[in-house]
Every structure is written in C-alpha cells, then in structure tokens.
Swiss-Prot record:
Component of cohesin complex, a complex required for the cohesion of sister chromatids after DNA replication. The cohesin complex apparently forms a large proteinaceous ring within which sister chromatids can be trapped. At anaphase, the complex is cleaved and dissociates from chromatin, allowing sister chromatids to segregate. The cohesin complex may also play a role in spindle pole assembly during mitosis. It comes from Mus musculus (Mouse). InterPro entries: ARM-type_fold (IPR016024), Cohesin_Scc3/SA (IPR039662), HEAT_SCC3-SA (IPR056396), SCD (IPR020839), STAG (IPR013721). Residues 1137-1146 have a biased composition (Basic and acidic residues). Residues 1076-1087 have a biased composition (Basic residues). The gene is Stag1. PANTHER family: COHESIN SUBUNIT SA-1 (PTHR11199:SF6), STROMAL ANTIGEN (PTHR11199). This is Cohesin subunit SA-1. The lineage of its organism: Eukaryota, Metazoa, Chordata, Craniata, Vertebrata. Residues 1062-1075 have a biased composition (Low complexity).
C-alpha cells in the first residue's frame, strides 16, 4: 500500500474494531500474509491461509494500517524507501508473472470486493500518470465524475509526459505489461466474477468517464484499457459461442436418440447449460455494447492520433477474432471512414487491420460491399505522402487482387503499375509484388503443367518474359529498366534469372505459328537482361534506390557468388553469338558489351574456355571496326580494360589483341592525317571521314588505356594548329583532337607522379601543357560552339589539375608543372561564362524553335550550361581564379535562380569559408555592377519603385540572409561591406554642385538591406564613417532624391535600446525586418564598451583588412517574438494554479486554438449542450478543472475522417440500427448504470456534438 493510502483506512476506523494485542501468532500471520491483499498490487501468496470469518474483518483492516510492507508471490517487495509496492509498480516492474498478480487480486476480490476494486481504480489512475489516490470513502460516496475531477487536480503540471508516452525501454515494456494485465484479468475472471454485475460495471463506468475527460493522459490510458478490455471480452464471447454450439449439438444428439436410450436428466442439464451460456452471452454483449458505444464511437475520432490509432487497431482485432459478430458493414465503416485520417500512423493502422481481414479468403464475401465502397480510397492511398502508408496500401491492394481479380479495374491496376519505377524502394518492391501477381501468376494449370517439362523459349518463363517486355515497352520509361528489375527482384527472381530462356528468345528463330519478336522488343529484352545480370552480380539496388551498399549476409553472399558463376558460365558461351547476331545494331551492342564486367574471369582459365575468349575478342574487334558511335566505342574500350586486368591469367592474351588493334588504328590515323594536311582545303569527305572515324576510336580507347607510346599528341596538335591557322578544320575533328590531346597529357602526368621523373621529363610535360593551353585559349574564339565549349571545359580541368594543389602530399618536386592563369585568360574564361551560360530565355527558346528541339533537348542544353558554370566556379573556389570574378556570377543569383541557384549558392558558401572579408567585398561588387548597369540604362535619376531597383534590393536581401544568425563571426565582413558600399555611393560628385545628390546615392537604399547584420556597436561606427562623407547641406536635405540617405542613416541610428535589427525608411520600401526586443527582460550585468572606443577603429584600414572593435561581450539575444504571460480567461478560472492548455496540445490542436479565442461564447454554448445530453454528465464536474492538462474540446472531431461524397453523408446520418444495441438490464448492484444507458450511438449526437467548429463535416 502506498503511503498516501494510509488515510483511507484511518478514516474508516469507525467501521472496524481494534486489533487485539493478544491475538494468536496464526492470526498475525494471516493479517500480514492474506488480508494485506487489500493493498494495491498484491500478488498471490504461495501458502494459502484459511478464509477469515466476517468477525475478523475489522482486525485484518487494522492490521493493514500497521503493516509496513507488501507481498508478491508470498515474498515481501519494497521500494527504496521501504514503502510497499503498488499494483501499478508491480505491473511496471514486470518481475512477477502476470497470472500470479491477477490471481492474488481475485483472491482479494472474493474477500472484499470494494477494497479490490479500489486497488484496480487506483491502478488505472496511476497508470495515467496521476499522483492522486482514490480513498475508500471517495469510492463509496462519490460519483465517477466527482472522483475524476478530484484526480484531475492532483496531476503534476510540470510535465506533460505520462507512462504511455514516456521514452525508454522500461516504459515500452510497461505498455505491454499493462495490456497483458487487462487481458489476463478478464481471462481469469471469465467464469464467475465478470457476471456478478458489480466488478465489470464499476470498471466500465470508470473507464467511460476517464475516456471522456479533457485530460489527455486520462483519455489515452483509459481508451487503451477499454479497447484491450473489449478485446478480452470478444475472446470470452467467442468461447461462449463455441460452447453454445457444442452444447446445442450435444442436446440435438441426445434428443434424437430413441426414447429408451434417451437420458432425460442429461437433456435437462444440457438445456440448463445452454440457458446459462445464453445468459452469459447476453451479459457479455451488453458489456461490449457499453464499451463500444460509450468509448469507441467517441474516441475513434479523438483529436489525438495515438488514441484514434488504438481504436482502429483493436476493432481490426475484433473483426478478425470474431468475424461472425463484428465483420459487417456496421463496424467496417469506421475503418473505411478513418482511411481519410490526417495522420499517417492512423491510416497505417487502418490498412494493417484490413490486411489481416483480406488475408483470409473465406472472409471475402463479407468484405464485398466494403471493397466496392472504399476501393477507390485504398487505391489512391498507394500514392500516400507517407511512404509507410503507401507500402501497406499497395500490399492491401495486392491482397484484394489475390482474393478477387474482378474487384480491381484495369485503371486501378494501372495506378499501381507505375509505382514499380518509384525511387523509394519499399514502395517499388510492393508494387513489383502486385505486378507479379497480376501478370505472372495467372496461368492455366493444365497448360502450365504441359509447359513445365520444356526449357528455354518454350518453357513457362518464355511467355512471362514476353509479357515483361511488353509491359516495359508500354510503360515508355526505357531508361528505368534497372528500376523495374529491382522492383521485381524479390517476387520474380526465378523468372529474372532465367538467362537461358532470354538468350534463346534472342538467338533462336521462332517456331512455326509463333510470333517473332520485333526489333523494339529485342532491344528491350537485351536491356532488361543486362539489368538482371547487374542485379545478380552486385546484389544491391541501382543508383538512386537505397542509402548505399549494405553488408551482405553469409547467405546473400553465397547466392551472389553462385549467381555470378552461373551467369559467367552461360554468357561466356552465348555472348559472342549475341554480338555476332546484333553487331550491326549500336544500341544492342552497347548493352551487350556491359555484360563482361560482371564475369568471374577466372572461369576462362579454370573452365578451359579460352576459345570462347578468342571468339569474344574477335567480335569486339569487329564491333570497333564497324561502329563510330561514342557509346559503343566506350563500351568496347571498357571491356578491353576489364579483360586486361593484371590479376587474371588471360591478361597477356587480351593485351596482345588490344595492341594489335591499336597498331592498326594508329597507322591508319597517321596516314589519314598526312593525306588530310597535304590536301588542305581540297580534302574530300572521305579523307575527313577517315581521320574523324579513326580519331574517335583512338580517343575512346585513350580514355581507359595508356597509349602514350604511340605518341598521339603530335598529330592531334598538328590538326589543332592547322585548324587555328587556316580555319578550315571540321569542328568534330577539332573536338576529338582536343579530347585526345587532353587524355595524352593526363597519362603523361600519371607516369610522372607514379615514378621518379627527371627534370627533363618535367620540362617536356610543361612545354606540352603550355602549348596545349595556348591552343585551347585560342579555340575559345572559334566560331563553332562545340569547339568553344570543349576548349573551355578542358581549360578549366587542366587549370585545376596543374594548380598549386599539384604539390600537396609531399610532391613539391612537381612545382615546374604548376600553371597560374594570367589576367587575360581569366577574363576570357569569365566572358565565355557570361556569353554561353547566362543567356536570355527568349534567345534560348528561339534557338530551340529554330532547331526544332523538344523538351528533352532543352533539358540537355541546360545540363551542359550547368556543367560549364560548375567548372568555372571550381576555379574560384580553389583560388585559381581571383575571387572578384565571382561578382559577375553572384549578380545573376536571382534572375537565374531556377537554373543555377544551387551552384551559385554553393559557390558563395565555399568562398565565404575561404575568406569572409573578400567574399563580402565580392558581394557588394556584384550589387555595384548591377547598379551601374541600371544607371546606364535609365540614367542617374532612378525610379526607386521600379522593378529593376526592387530586384537589386531583393538580391541584397538574399545576400544578407546568407550571413546567418551569428553576427560575431560575420562582424568584420559585414563592416567591410558597408564601408565599400558607402565609398561607392559617394565616389563621384554631382556635376551640378554639392546641393545635388551624388549619382550613386541611391545605392545606399540597397546597402540598408545589410544593416540588420551589423552589431549595435558597429552601427554607430558605420554611422560615424558615413558622416565623414556628408556635408551639413546633405544632412539637412529632405527631398525625395535624398531619401536613400535618410533611409540608410535611419537603419544605422535605430536599434539603440530596443536592439532592432533593421529599419527600412522611405515610401518605396515595403519590406520589414524582424525586430528583436528586450522589453520586459531583466537587465544582464555585463561590461559595456564605451562609444568612444568604437569610433574609427576600422575606418583607416586597408581595403582587404578591417580591425574589429575591441573585445566585446556576447550581445544579449532575445526571441523574435516575446511570449506574453497574460491570460485573457484568467478571471473566469477560480483556481490560482490554473492556466491555459498545455503548449504541445495547443500548438497541435487547431480546435483548441479556436476554442481559446472564443472562450466566453463557447462556454455558454457548451453548457447548454452538456445539460441536454446525458452522456456528457461526467464532464459537468470538471469544466473548471486544471487547464494546464486539459484540452478545451471534449469530443474533438478530426476533419478528414470521412470521404467527401454524398453516399458517405448518408452513411453518417443513418441510425446504426444494425449494430449491437443491447443494454445491460438495470440492477441494484450496478453502479452508475444511468451513465451507460443513454444511446450515444445516435448519428445526430456525433454530428451535432459541441466539439465541432460549426462547419459541415463534408
């Protein structure tokens, strides 16, 4: 017994007699061991004692007062303070077997049911986190509403947590123990106690009142208890139904016997038993009806998502457990309506509940009407914004399809089909399982049995693979074949690994009567086949799915190795045949050449399959000679690179074949170049084609192979110089020559960095790089855009590679190879970016229309421009190009935000990390450039309200936001920015005289956007610096042309004691900055810096350095909006400790926010509604309870419960006559029966409840 319970027995001493000191030892033992079961949490004793006579009751209760410990399982249990353990603590600790705890309580109940029920009541109160305790006189003399109101006042207002919401493994275990306790309690009481018309009435009445409370903890805990209680009762009802059926069968069997063999006594016993079972069944149904109508109907619409989820989860259990009673439309509609809940966790519980029902195909007839009604909603949930909900919705749709294919229309299926291409893997896998069941699991059993003996194209998988290809083509997402394969991998792995069938479909001619595959189908099948090979060999999802490669389990690793061996052994033989058949098709060949990278190349040697390797090399050589497409040549080059890996024994054989191939191409290239250069402008198309085709092949191979010994750079350089000098070189040859020369330089650098180069080697490479950089720089002025773009990218790459970072890592000897771009080259690179990246949208659209390019080409062009900008931005970030060049990029931040905003923002962030001050000077320079351009267009008299001026100010505001919230870190940078801005504004004097404003004065209005980033002390310093440029005449001016100066001065002067961050003056400014106020805050004792020490501390610094004011204390930071402590409704609340609803409840419950605003009016309305509805009686006593733990809305309704359809409105307005409406009959032993009898299942009560907002539900 807890200490607070001691007054319970002290107050009831008038009902008991004193315990005799002369009592026997046996009596004392009994008092300690048995009668102390009246205390909460008494587990059963291992040694059973004789029951006490009624005369001993007083002595026992007196003994309880003197007892200082409790028992569990016959052993004393105490907490650290020596106080006895309560029932709540026993359940929380979970050390005792739950059945023992329940048996002990039952034993106590048989002796004194009031004391036992008091224990149980306090158990529910304490499980809600309430510190109060119900005393015996409260239990006997007070109504539930009064008890609940009293307990509400005992809540701890300091914390909003209660056991069901507390974090940690102990409290998670408590929840399961709590639910287990209730289930075991009903199970152990199911044969007698629950029918005594006292225990269950008391518990149900209490839980009904608690579930109707405004206190979340009470509602949450009591709803969980009531739902688990209902589940246990459903189990009891199910058992009773089974017993009734058995009894009825026994009765029928006995009655059908011949009269001579019939036992009349047995018939009477069976009739009596059937009658008792029927009475018990009726009693249980009354209890379930009371819980359902008194608690579930209201709480499944609760404002708290956890409470709604509990209700939906349990009703799913009832319908699955006792489908004969609960699986009907009267109960299913609650799940259907809640599919529209606004919280994902509630929708998830609905889907889980339905899945458990649709899993049983025998239940489908009972679900038919529900399926027709809510199928559209379920299908739409496959696109739920919560991925977990979407996954379960797809699984539910799959179950519906499995049970009844006619239930889903073609449109429904198509809505799920496209999800196999989702980037979220669980969604895609679930959709893949649906696709598998829909397309690959419907076969004629006889036909399938006949085909099962066949292999290859005639096997069952042959038709399925054709279906997969057709699906892939119809989806028109050919670039996502890897996603489709990954989606089907778990459900259709056997089909996807049938490479034998796939290759037979590709290689063999169709038999008579069989339709041949089209060219598109063959291309799709090859693409899918390559994706399945990749998936099997790598054993992880494709790029874009999943967070990365996970560690494979031993089983997965073994499967991966087996699959790799299987595919290697198969395609070593078939790949040369496939290449031979499709050698003329570039797309097919490029895909097929991806396969060797997934081989286990050791099998060539261990399996004695060198002849197949020779066949493969022969086919690859044939493909290289036949094709000039970049994709094909790169695939061939990569295949050679893989086969030439040094760790494999086949390396020598492949290297010889590769060298022979390169020798042929180099000889051909050298001769064709000589011919082309000799003929000059008279060269014909054949000469040009010979050079271009051979150069393309060599360039593709040079990317992955070191071809420096063939000295390709010489002839490439000759082609480039000739093209520059004479201008007649075809652009494709120039582009390929540039790329090939670039690869040659990189391979030379690799040799030098890997070895110990001589000084001569370094000088030779330096000369090569210098000459190539000069050629690239000259190409920037080429008339052909592809040439210019190629030259620009190579320039940026080489300047990055041969920058000062080349010497890092102990490679100081490479200093001769470092190149720093001169001013002229930097200017040319910047000009190229301005001309080719920041182009007008109108020009782009016109060019696209002229070239008849579609949307895909526009995206490709944008991607190319983004690469150009990123390449130049890297030069700025790595300090290869001067940072001030970034000003021309930063000024386009707003205009091209959608296209390049992320790149510019990242460049700005990186440059600030390098040098905050220089970055700030670059930002102000970009604004000055925009301002100068505007002045040139509109003249010195700018319209401050024009869109152009507003655009510059908006850009300045965006730049100011990038400085962040830490003003100490950005202090010097912001001060430098203001200094440069002031100097720019007063750089030129007005030629008309000093009485006229300087031409750039309007720039101060732009500069004022950065005033909010100045510390208060720095504002004074900046203001002092500004005044150095002002004359007395300027200070006295108030005309409109001087408004920028007035605005800027005000932004610096304001923020004295209020510490406001910025003030925008002038009629044209519509933006306001956040205001930080210190009003109402206690003063902080800190050292204040004198104003004199701040003046001119950084005014005389150089352009690149600025001295910050002396060491300053951290400024006092206040919240942007100070929370007021006043309470508008405080006068209406009597309790001094009361306050508004808890902040979490208030923030997340819009109904509370409305109700607090309209409190007086709602109070009157609520009071009338409460008096008119009997079931609101419980709340009448708690209307003015502690506000800190209450939610104003007693019956909150969430808006998204219903579907917006007329049919559901009719469903909502029906009278629910088909639901159980059996009420418990009145009895003198039933407590507060009036609270359970009213029919709150009336639809009118649901819709007209005072918790609504006065708005329609639909």
């Amino acid at each position: 017994m807890i200490t607070s319970e001691l007054p319970v027995l002290q107050d009831s001493t008038n009902e008991t007699t004193a315990h005799s000191d002369a009592g026997s030892e046996l009596e004392e033992t009994e008092v300690k061991g048995k009668r102390k079961r009246g205390r909460p949490g008494r587990p059963p004793s291992t040694n059973k004692k004789p029951r006490k006579s009624p005369g001993e009751k007083s002595r026992i209760e007196a003994g309880i007062r003197g007892a200082g410990r409790g028992r569990a399982n016959g052993h004393p249990q105490q907490n650290g303070d020596g106080d006895p353990v309560t029932l709540f603590e026993v359940v929380k600790l979970g050390k005792s077997a739950m059945q023992s705890v329940v048996d002990d309580w039952i034993e106590l109940y048989k002796q004194d049911r009031d004391i036992a029920l008091l224990d149980l009541i306090n158990f529910f109160i304490q499980c809600s986190g309430c510190r109060g305790t119900v005393r015996i006189e409260m239990f006997r003399n007070m109504q539930n509403a009064e008890i609940i109101r009293k307990m509400t006042e005992e809540f701890d207002e300091d914390s909003g947590d209660y056991p069901l919401t507390m974090p940690g493994p102990q409290w998670k275990k408590f929840r399961s123990n709590f639910c287990e306790f209730i289930g075991v309690l009903i199970r152990q009481c199911q044969y007698s106690i629950i029918y005594d018309e006292y225990m269950m009435d008391t518990v149900i009445s209490l839980l009904t009142g608690l579930s109707d409370s405004q206190v979340r903890a009470f509602r949450h805990t009591s709803t969980l208890a009531a739902m688990k209680l209902m589940t246990a009762l459903v189990n009891v009802a199910l058992n009773l139904s089974i017993h009734q059926d058995n009894t009825q069968r026994q009765y029928e069997a006995e009655r059908n016997k011949m009269i001579g063999k019939r036992a009349n006594e047995r018939l009477e016993l069976l009739l009596q038993k059937r009658k008792e079972l029927q009475e018990n069944q009726d009693e249980i149904e009354n209890m379930m009806n009371s819980i359902f109508k008194g608690i579930f109907v209201h709480r499944y619409r609760d404002a708290i998502a956890e409470i709604r989820a509990i209700c939906i989860e349990e009703i799913g259990v009832w319908m699955k457990m006792y489908s004969d009673a609960f699986l009907n439309d009267s109960y299913l509609k609650y799940v259907g309506w809640t599919l529209h809940d606004r919280q994902g966790e509630v929708r998830l519980k609905c889907l889980k509940a339905l899945q458990s029902l649709y899993t049983n195909r025998e239940l489908f007839p009972k679900l038919e009407l529900f399926t027709n009604r809510f199928k559209d909603r379920i299908v739409s949930m496959t696109l739920d914004k919560e991925y977990d909900v979407a996954v379960e919705a797809i699984r539910l749709v799959t179950l519906i399809l499995h049970g009844s294919e006619e239930a889903l229309s073609n449109e429904d299926c198509e809505n799920v089909y496209h999800l196999v291409y989702s980037a979220h893997r669980p969604v895609a896998v679930a959709a893949g399982e649906f696709l598998h069941k829909k397309l690959f699991s419907r076969h004629d059993p006889q036909a399938e049995e006949a085909l099962a003996k066949r292999r290859g194209r005639n096997s069952p998988n042959g038709n399925l693979i054709r279906m997969l290809v057709l699906f892939f083509l119809e989806s028109e997402l050919h670039e996502h074949a890897a996603y489709l394969v990954d989606s089907l991998w778990e459900s259709s792995q056997e089909l996807l690994k049938d490479w034998e069938c796939m290759t037979e479909l590709l290689l063999e001619e169709p038999v008579q009567g069989e339709e041949a595959m089209s060219d598109r189908q063959e291309s799709a099948l090859i693409e899918l086949m390559v994706c399945t090979i990749r998936q099997a060999a790598e054993a992880h999802p494709p790029v874009g799915r999943g967070t990365g490669k996970r560690v494979l389990t031993a089983k997965e690793r073994k499967t991966q190795i087996d699959d790799r061996n299987k595919l290697t052994e198969h395609f070593i033989i078939t790949l040369p045949m496939l290449l031979s058949k499709y050698s003329a098709d570039a797309e097919k060949v490029a895909n097929l050449l991806q396969i060797p990278q997934y081989f286990d190349l050791e099998i060539y040697s261990t399996g004695r399959m060198e002849k197949h390797l020779d066949a493969l090399l022969k086919q690859i050589k044939f493909v290289v000679e036949k094709h000039v497409e970049s994709d094909v040549l790169e695939a061939c080059s990569k295949t050679y690179s893989i086969l030439c890996s040094e760790e494999y024994t086949i390396q020598n054989r492949v290297d010889i074949a590769r060298s022979q191939l390169i020798d042929e191409f180099v000889d051909r290239f050298n001769h064709s170049v000589e011919d082309l250069l000799q003929e000059g402008e008279e060269a014909d198309d054949d000469d040009i084609y010979n050079v271009l085709s051979t150069l393309k092949r060599l360039t593709s191979f040079h990317n992955a192979h070191d071809l420096t010994k063939w000295d390709l750079f010489g002839n490439c350089y000759r082609l480039l110089k000739t093209g520059i000098e004479h201008g007649a070189m075809p652009e494709q040859i120039v582009v390929q020559a540039l790329q090939c020369s670039h690869y040659s330089i990189l391979w030379q650098l690799v040799k030098i960095t890997d070895g110990s180069p001589s000084k001569e080697d370094l000088l030779v490479l330096r000369k090569t790089v210098k000459s190539f950089l000069a050629v690239c720089q000259q190409c920037l002025s080429n008339v052909n855009t592809p040439v210019k773009e190629q030259a620009f990218m190579l320039l940026c790459d080489l300047l990055m590679i041969f920058s000062h970072q080349l010497m890092t890592g102990g490679r100081e000897g490479l200093q001769p190879l470092v190149f720093n771009p001169d001013t002229g080259l930097q200017s040319e690179l910047l000009s190229f970016v301005m001309d080719h990246v920041f182009i007008d949208q109108d020009e782009e659209n016109q060019s696209m229309e002229g070239d008849e390019e579609d949307e895909a080409n526009k995206i490709e062009a944008l991607h190319k421009r983004r690469n150009l900008l990123a390449a130049f931005s890297k030069l700025i970030i790595y300090d290869i190009v001067d940072m001030h060049a970034a000003a021309d990029i930063f000024k386009h931040y707003m205009k091209y935000y959608n296209d390049y905003g992320d790149i510019i923002k990242e460049t700005l962030s990186k440059t600030r990390q390098i040098d905050k001050i220089q970055c700030a000077k670059t930002l102000i320079l970009s604004l000055q450039q925009l301002f100068n351009e505007l002045v040139q267009e509109q003249g010195p008299n700018l319209d401050r309200t024009s869109a152009h001026v507003s655009g510059i100010k908006e850009l300045a505001r965006r730049f100011a936001l990038t400085f962040g919230l830490d003003q100490i870190k950005t202090r010097e940078a912001v001060a430098t920015l203001h200094k440069d801005g002031i100097e720019f504004a007063f750089k030129y004097q007005n030629q008309k005289g000093q009485e006229y404003p300087p031409p750039n004065l309007a720039f101060l209005e732009v500069l004022s956007e950065f005033s909010s980033k100045l510390l208060r002390q720095d504002k004074k310093t900046v203001h002092s610096y500004l005044e150095k440029f002002l004359t007395e005449q300027m200070m006295e001016r108030r005309e409109d042309v001087w408004l920028p100066l007035i605005s800027y001065r005000n932004s610096l002067v304001t923020g004295g004691e209020d510490d406001r961050m910025s003030v925008n003056s002038g009629s044209s400014s519509s933006k306001t900055s956040s205001v930080r106020s210190k009003k109402g805050r206690p003063p902080l004792h800190r050292k204040r810096v004198e104003d004199e020490s701040l003046d001119n501390t950084w005014l005389n610094r150089t352009d690149t350095m600025i001295q910050t004011p002396g060491p300053l204390p951290t400024p006092q930071l206040t919240s942007t909006v100070l929370r007021e402590n006043s309470r508008p409704m405080g006068e209406q609340i009597q309790e001094p400790e009361s306050e508004h609803g808890s902040e979490p409840d208030f923030l997340h419950n819009p109904q509370m926010q409305i109700s607090w605003l309209g409190q007086p009016k709602l109070e009157d309305l609520n009071r009338k509604d409460r008096t008119g509805m009997n079931y609101m009686k419980v709340r009448a006593g708690v209307r003015h309870a502690v506000r800190g733990l209450m939610e104003e809305d007693a019956e909150p309704i969430f808006e998204d419960v219903m579907m917006s359809s007329r049919s559901q409105l009719e469903d909502m307005n029906e009278e629910f006559e088909d639901t159980m409406v059996i009420d418990l009959p009145p009895s003198r032993n039933r407590r507060e029966r009036a609270e359970l009898r009213p029919d709150f299942f009336d639809s009118a009560a649901i819709i007209e409840d005072d918790s609504g907002f006065g708005m329609p539900m639909f």
